[in-house]
């Protein structure tokens, strides 16, 4: 008894398809090569990229052939570039320059304004050109307000004009006497500490 999956090999009675008339005189490998050439020609006529099989890549014939030359001791476009220069070019090309400048104001605060100011004031936010600076005491906040124009000039010299247009100097938050969940509003905070 034989089942549908029993296969003892090709049937002897199966007809072998005959090649087309224009290929009737070819046999064996010549028939295969000619058929492959026709298939590649049909693919080219449809605009498809035709593979080259196992042969190597096609060499350029004539035309604009340039031999590589040594770059010499001077700087060249192929020389390794500094990481800072490459990232700066990337930021410019992607339109990130303003965001990078804003981040450098906060990230390099101590280098921008100096140690004496950085010890008593911390930048907290930069939104639309307004830099919010929190001072550790009301006296420090008052001193920062007096030198505000010099601070803006220092910041503009380091990161460029227009990044920071105004300084908002905030003193320390006063203590809260609020206890519990419920609260009755009083007369507001007093400047008793600071």
Curated annotation (Swiss-Prot):
List where Basic and acidic residues composition bias occurs. Answer: 30-52
Q: Give the start-end ranges of region Disordered.
A: 1-81
Coiled-coil features, chain-numbered ranges: none
Q: Pfam families given for it?
A: DciA
| Domain of life (superkingdom) | Bacteria
The residue ranges flagged as biased composition, category Acidic residues, are 1-14
Q: List the disulfide bonds.
A: none
Return the NCBIfam families for the record: PRK03195.1
HAMAP family xrefs: UPF0232
- Family listed: Belongs to the UPF0232 family.
Name assigned to this protein? UPF0232 protein in recF-gyrB intergenic region
Q: Which organism encodes this protein?
A: Mycolicibacterium smegmatis (Mycobacterium smegmatis)
Taxonomic lineage of the native organism: Bacteria, Bacillati, Actinomycetota, Actinomycetes, Mycobacteriales
């Amino acid at each position: 008894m034989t089942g549908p999956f029993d296969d003892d090999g090709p049937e002897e009675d199966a007809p072998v398809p005959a090649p087309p008339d224009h290929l009737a005189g070819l046999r064996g490998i010549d028939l295969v090569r000619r058929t492959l050439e026709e298939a590649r020609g049909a693919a080219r006529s449809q605009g498809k990229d035709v593979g080259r099989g196992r042969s190597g890549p096609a060499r350029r014939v004539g035309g604009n052939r340039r031999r590589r030359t040594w770059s010499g001791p001077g700087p060249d476009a192929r020389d390794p570039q500094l990481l800072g220069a490459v990232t700066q070019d990337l930021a410019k090309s992607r339109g990130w320059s303003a965001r990078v400048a804003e981040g450098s104001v906060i990230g390099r605060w101590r280098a921008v304004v100096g140690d004496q100011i950085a010890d008593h004031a911390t930048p907290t936010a930069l939104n639309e050109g307004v830099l919010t600076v929190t001072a550790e005491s009301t006296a420090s906040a008052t001193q920062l307000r007096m030198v505000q124009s010099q601070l803006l000039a220092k910041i503009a010299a380091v990161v460029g004009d227009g990044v920071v247009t105004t300084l908002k100097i905030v003193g320390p938050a006063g203590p809260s006497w609020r206890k519990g969940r419920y609260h009755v509003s009083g007369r507001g905070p007093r400047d008793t500490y600071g």
